[in-house]
């Protein structure tokens, strides 16, 4: 649970089970975000200068959710948008996850976060929820329990991440 403190900092308190769960989830997220060698870079000069990324949306629905098309009605514009933005966006997501992992690796029962670290946590938790929601086929908050074949442990984790994100938003505001 996140709580605000005087001076703009926040505290995070977790029990051992929460700590273990979050460490595992952030490790999986880091693995998901590892950038594969892209064969889809359209501009050879951009590839040589490491200036551009893939022009194709990922076949993995979770990655497609994290890196959606910029223009749903213009395939060419969407490819250009992806080529020039995905690498930077991916780096930001990796950095946010790394901040959360660092917080957990230095765990002593309670942690104090700066505003910048809290923003990284917010990004990382949001991305975890997007990935898990995609894997569980949750399309909006109203249908969380609509699929009788849903993984109930996955739903519990999704709800926990939602709660944790909510406490962080409350602490930030």
What are these regions (language model features)?
Residues 1-89, 99, 109, 120, ...:
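Charged, alpha-helix-forming regions
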Residues 94-97:
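Surface-exposed helix/loop patches within compact recognition domains
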Residues 102-106, 111-114:
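Extended, compositionally biased non-globular segments
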